[in-house]
Amino acid sequence: MSVTLGTKRKEGGIAETARVIVHALIIALVIRTFLFQPFNIPSGSMEETLLVGDYLFVSKYSYGYSHYSLPFSPPLFSGRIWSANPQRGDVVVFRLPKDDSIDYIKRVIGLPGDHIQMINGLLHINGEPVKRERIEDFVDTDENGRTMRVKRWRETLPNGVSYTTLELIENGFYDNTPVYEVPPGNFFMMGDNRDNSTDSRVLSQVGYVPLENIIGRAQVIFFSIRGGEHAWEVWTWPWSVRWGRLLTIVR
């Protein structure tokens, strides 16, 4: 009798544990699909807004949902449901149109119908130069530990959104471009680190981004570790974590 009772209790405990795990996985899947999804920053194309080693939450609900919102992106439907358009200046994660297995994060610069052009390193939207002012240099260290000073600008879009951009070199390859006319239903994306960003200026690699490819809006940095360090090495956190960036709102 006692052996049978003990066996039943053990089986009941295992079943309860399994139910808790299944429920937790379902809740996590719902949150990841419909509310927030974590991403990390692998490159410096959005410096200094986002740094290599930043981990952030992206809101999935900001622009509605497409099949790219779902795990593994099954082509269950086309277009978006509960759709809302990104605004100029939003920092968004999207699937690369040329290879939809790759996620990119950039800033929305051009809306459908806009004309975008770079002239001598200055952004022009619909024929008008975007306001920018020089601010103090961005100071960083290279892979050899040497201090680098990079020109930094504050750029303000026509809707009043301001952010900083970096200028690594003068007369960069994409400092002078033809006029890009953004097609209907598409958006023009650029990185804040203008001379180190493969973005919509490179039509052969990125080009215009359809609304359907947009996954969500970057909201908050929840963790940040210096580039080259590993987040799982918790014993290095006291000196490798960028504590000042934790819970920073992405703007």
Please report, for each region that a protein language model flagged, where it lies by residue.
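Soluble "head" domains of membrane/secretory-pathway proteins
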Residues: S2-A15, V30, F34-N40, S45-R251
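Alpha-helical transmembrane spans of integral membrane proteins, capturing the lipid-embedded, hydrophobic core
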Residues: T17-I21, L25, L29
